[in-house]
Amino acid sequence: MDGKVAVQECGPPAVSWVPEEGEKLDQEDEDQVKDRGQWTNKMEFVLSVAGEIIGLGNVWRFPYLCYKNGGGAFFIPYFIFFFVCGIPVFFLEVALGQYTSQGSVTAWRKICPLFQGIGLASVVIESYLNVYYIIILAWALFYLFSSFTSELPWTTCNNFWNTEHCTDFLNHSGAGTVTPFENFTSPVMEFWERRVLGITSGIHDLGSLRWELALCLLLAWVICYFCIWKGVKSTGKVVYFTATFPYLMLVILLIRGVTLPGAYQGIIYYLKPDLFRLKDPQVWMDAGTQIFFSFAICQGCLTALGSYNKYHNNCYKDCIALCFLNSATSFVAGFVVFSILGFMSQEQGVPISEVAESGPGLAFIAFPKAVTMMPLSQLWSCLFFIMLIFLGLDSQFVCVECLVTASIDMFPRQLRKSGRRELLILTIAVMCYLIGLFLVTEGGMYIFQLFDYYASSGICLLFLSLFEVVCISWVYGADRFYDNIEDMIGYRPWPLVKISWLFLTPGLCLATFLFSLSKYTPLKYNNVYVYPPWGYSIGWFLALSSMVCVPLFVVITLLKTRGPFRKRLRQLITPDSSLPQPKQHPCLDGSAGRNFGPSPTREGLIAGEKETHL
């Protein structure tokens, strides 16, 4: 790769977990293998990462957490986690990818073979995300198509899906009061539950396939496929539009939102600080998990995207800018959301706490209800769902791209040949689509909630981030990694980053992880429906299937490597000798011993493709 420096032969070679290119490829195959590729320019990388990390959670999760956890006071724990965990781990993953030029699995193999399970765990999480995250796009597409009508279908109770319990509450409200209707539902709720989902009584009854959602899901996958089928050459171009267009929509909705009556009261609810809430550990846990969710940490995406950078790209500045952009977007989205919720509160004459929602409830219930109260409701509905689609679309196709990158880097001989990449993406898309069909059945919402609550939960991300920072800072060596970064960008990053890797980030991650376990409450759909025991078993399987990769592959690699235990351990924490080294390598002054362990025997390695790809 551009700018890489050959390793000096000053000591025994480090363990090689990925076969050398000459060993992997026969001469006759080399002509058929495509180059790995790089971003054409820095902007493609920045927009691709921005598209991945700036998604639906910025709009429907962060504003609600601020309101729920003390308004402006929530920014105190949020920014503590931002500086101590968010930026350091975000930068670590991007720098790791840029340094190794590998996807998530092979990057960790090269750095520390013993902890290759970190990369495999991230692939598991990526796979789950690719199955269920795109379901939100299918819902949004359904709402978008439904908005092209003379009257929004969730405005009245005169539709074939409505029940006798449907009541338009606005037509029964006086000036500032609402008559209670305990056994009645709103038209927007019935549209969501009966028209879109057709929801059943529980996960035990999946019902039939919602064919309209299945077609919307198919359309979403077709779009994703053609966004990435040519690799970074196509992805880098597509993100110019998909990553910037949502900002135009956000600005339009912001201008509309703050000019609505009642918007000021909604914004006050959003920002009014309640410092007493900081005594609640739950507030701190919410801040920490939000950082990990919104920064796409421990999902393998950042490492894969960073791997397409040029070796001397200044990823440090890029990461800091992207982290601030992500948080700023969340902050601005809060003004959009709560100005509209304030408007709803005033129009309905109810406290804002009764209209505040998060997650799908905000996107598919609260906001659709709000647009029915506005002039030109179809226009605002279309703009909102177009914004949602683009926010989710680039997060989805970048996540698929990262899974493809990890797979190709694991099997370069088989998958880098002409036409193989397109076939691999098609295979992933078809498999995820077929699995996703279970999530667009009448009982699919219950499965979706299991994926969302367990598969990529804060517990999983905190667990993996703890191992990531421990592996880099204490096993590979924070100083050594700083040397590598200095070789790439020309200077050493702010010392707080290294201090965070060594002490602050592991401590906060461990504390938050343990607290999350202690405060665990089983999932309830709508806070009402209790899953059967086998449903929770599926949920915990989704959660543990990623976390177990780390200890499992530590044991497997130790057992499959030959030799005395201490020798095996030393071999498996030795980085790959093919990794680029700083120009002023320590071996030049006779101090190579701290960087390289003893030479591993070829027979003792388990890095070959046949032995490690289980």
Swiss-Prot record:
The keyword Glycoprotein applies. It is found in: Basolateral cell membrane; Cell membrane. SUPFAM superfamilies: SNF-like. GO terms for cellular component: basolateral plasma membrane; cell projection; membrane; plasma membrane; presynapse. GO terms for molecular function: amino acid transmembrane transporter activity; gamma-aminobutyric acid:sodium:chloride symporter activity; monocarboxylic acid transmembrane transporter activity. Expressed in kidney, liver, heart, skeletal muscle, placenta, and a widespread distribution in the brain. Keywords: Cell membrane, Disulfide bond, Glycoprotein, Membrane, Neurotransmitter transport, Symport, Transmembrane, Transmembrane helix, Transport. Disulfide bonds join 157-166. InterPro entries: Na/ntran_symport (IPR000175), Na/ntran_symport_betaine (IPR002983), SNS_sf (IPR037272). The chain crosses the membrane at residues 45-65, 73-92, 117-137, 211-229, 238-255, 291-308, 320-341, 374-393, 423-441, 458-478, 499-518, 538-556. It comes from the Eukaryota. Residues 1-44, 557-614 are cytoplasmic. Transporter that mediates cellular uptake of betaine and GABA in a sodium- and chloride-dependent process. May have a role in regulation of GABAergic transmission in the brain through the reuptake of GABA into presynaptic terminals, as well as in osmotic regulation. Probably also involved in renal and hepatic osmotic regulation. Interacts with LIN7C. This is Sodium- and chloride-dependent betaine transporter. It comes from Homo sapiens. The gene is SLC6A12.
